[in-house]
Amino acid sequence: MTIEQNKNRRSAASGCAIHCHDCSMGTLCIPFTLNANELDQLDDIIERKKPIQKGEQIFKSGDPLKSLFAIRSGTIKSYTITEQGDEQITGFHLAGDVIGFDGIHAQSHQSFAQALETSMVCEIPFNILDELSGTMPKLRQQIMRLMSNEIMSDQEMILLLSKKNAEERLAAFISNLANRFGNRGFSAKEFRLTMTRGDIGNYLGLTVETISRLLGRFQKSGLIEVKGKYIIIVDHHELNLLAGNARIAR
């Protein structure tokens, strides 16, 4: 599909009329560093989809790579299915994150992406994005930066699971989530967990019981307050010390 064909298809589609110029997540997403003309060209190929409902899948493992997806709002989890048929969560993605890079090598997705709450995404046709990036060095550089961030987060996750104990893993997860919300202009002190404790345990290699016990311990120690699904950071410094300053990029 050419850029012009996609532009016509996008115009005919029912979407949400927000543009890259107006998006508050632009500094975290693909448009970062582009000038006004380049931003217009990128904006022309993007399709804004209707809200994705909780539990709905954006893509499945084995689906051909057609697009990357920039998250405008909400939370998306990525996961794979093990040989035993069990779900293994590989990441939680927030507004400003771009997902779908896993499909570039084999031209098909290697994981699943599912909404944890009502979410909005921008669909970016990969072939046209690749064509545009050939004429826009800043765009290509930003795509490479985003891919590099994925590699770095995978490396940090391996380190977290192999070298950290249960307390350190959960502390790193909460601290990182707080920082990510803060980077997006939200409160880094108080936020809602859109993922279940089972999801968190799956991601960190811990049981649900361990997650619940540690949350209670953190609360008694004055690190956090837990109010249902809401987390309030009471002592960010001590939480970071417990985490060992593990970052986990995504």
UniProtKB/Swiss-Prot annotation:
GO terms for biological process: anaerobic respiration; regulation of DNA-templated transcription. Gene3D superfamilies: Jelly Rolls (2.60.120.10), Winged helix-like DNA-binding domain superfamily/Winged helix DNA-binding domain (1.10.10.10). GO terms for cellular component: cytosol. InterPro entries: cNMP-bd_dom, cNMP-bd_dom_sf, Env_Response_Regulators, HTH_CRP, RmlC-like_jellyroll, Tscrpt_reg_HTH_Crp-type_CS, WH-like_DNA-bd_sf, WH_DNA-bd_sf. Keywords: DNA-binding, Transcription, Transcription regulation. PROSITE patterns: CNMP_BINDING_3 (PS50042), HTH_CRP_1 (PS00042), HTH_CRP_2 (PS51063). Residues 164-237 form the HTH crp-type domain. GO terms for molecular function: DNA binding; DNA-binding transcription factor activity. Residues 197-216 bind DNA. Pfam families: cNMP_binding (PF00027), HTH_Crp_2 (PF13545). Monomer. Possesses 4 cysteines which may bind a metal ion (possibly iron). NCBIfam families: PRK11161.1 (NF008365). Regulates anaerobic growth on fumarate, nitrite, Fe(3+), TMAO, DMSO, thiosulfate and sulfite, but not on nitrate nor Mn(4+). This is Electron transport regulator A. It comes from Shewanella oneidensis (strain ATCC 700550 / JCM 31522 / CIP 106686 / LMG 19005 / NCIMB 14063 / MR-1). The gene is etrA.
